[in-house]
Amino acid sequence: MAQEFVNCKIQPGKVVVFIKPTCPYCRRAQEILSQLPIKQGLLEFVDITATNHTNEIQDYLQQLTGARTVPRVFIGKDCIGGCSDLVSLQQSGELLTRLKQIGALQ
């Protein structure tokens, strides 16, 4: 269930962030990405606590990305990491480059 749930969310050309709404790092990642000119429908925040499988989802994220913490940010099919990784990419200018590469920017 967790594997199918995660895999069906992660798609080429899309930005997906797995979050918990109470997590301050998740909120920060949401703020950063929401301010960018990402095309309608290509940015999705997935609240893993809205399922009854939070632990299983985090276990699968661990298997997939090497970390079970949230946020887990995917640009296309690539996991770029968490909030600090997102901030680093933003500061270096690499974030916009990666978003352009997958065709997610307006």
Curated annotation (Swiss-Prot):
<keyword id="KW-0249">Electron transport</keyword>
<dbReference type="GO" id="GO:0017080">
    <property type="term" value="F:sodium channel regulator activity"/>
</dbReference>
<feature type="modified residue" description="N6-succinyllysine">
    <location>
        <position position="9"/>
    </location>
</feature>
<dbReference type="GO" id="GO:0015038">
    <property type="term" value="F:glutathione disulfide oxidoreductase activity"/>
</dbReference>
<keyword id="KW-0963">Cytoplasm</keyword>
<comment type="similarity">
    <text>Belongs to the glutaredoxin family.</text>
</comment>
<feature type="disulfide bond">
    <location>
        <begin position="79"/>
        <end position="83"/>
    </location>
</feature>
<dbReference type="InterPro" id="IPR014025">
    <property type="entry name" value="Glutaredoxin_subgr"/>
</dbReference>
<dbReference type="Pfam" id="PF00462">
    <property type="entry name" value="Glutaredoxin"/>
</dbReference>
<feature type="domain" description="Glutaredoxin">
    <location>
        <begin position="3"/>
        <end position="106"/>
    </location>
</feature>
<keyword id="KW-0813">Transport</keyword>
<feature type="disulfide bond" description="Redox-active">
    <location>
        <begin position="23"/>
        <end position="26"/>
    </location>
</feature>
<dbReference type="InterPro" id="IPR036249">
    <property type="entry name" value="Thioredoxin-like_sf"/>
</dbReference>
<protein>
    <recommendedName>
        <fullName>Glutaredoxin-1</fullName>
    </recommendedName>
</protein>
<dbReference type="GO" id="GO:0045838">
    <property type="term" value="P:positive regulation of membrane potential"/>
</dbReference>
<dbReference type="InterPro" id="IPR011767">
    <property type="entry name" value="GLR_AS"/>
</dbReference>
<comment type="function">
    <text>Has a glutathione-disulfide oxidoreductase activity in the presence of NADPH and glutathione reductase. Reduces low molecular weight disulfides and proteins.</text>
</comment>
<dbReference type="GO" id="GO:0005634">
    <property type="term" value="C:nucleus"/>
</dbReference>
<dbReference type="InterPro" id="IPR002109">
    <property type="entry name" value="Glutaredoxin"/>
</dbReference>
<dbReference type="GO" id="GO:0070062">
    <property type="term" value="C:extracellular exosome"/>
</dbReference>
<dbReference type="GO" id="GO:0005829">
    <property type="term" value="C:cytosol"/>
</dbReference>
<feature type="modified residue" description="N-acetylalanine">
    <location>
        <position position="2"/>
    </location>
</feature>
<keyword id="KW-1015">Disulfide bond</keyword>
<dbReference type="GO" id="GO:0015949">
    <property type="term" value="P:nucleobase-containing small molecule interconversion"/>
</dbReference>
<dbReference type="InterPro" id="IPR047185">
    <property type="entry name" value="GLRX1"/>
</dbReference>
<keyword id="KW-0007">Acetylation</keyword>
<keyword id="KW-0676">Redox-active center</keyword>
<dbReference type="InterPro" id="IPR011899">
    <property type="entry name" value="Glutaredoxin_euk/vir"/>
</dbReference>
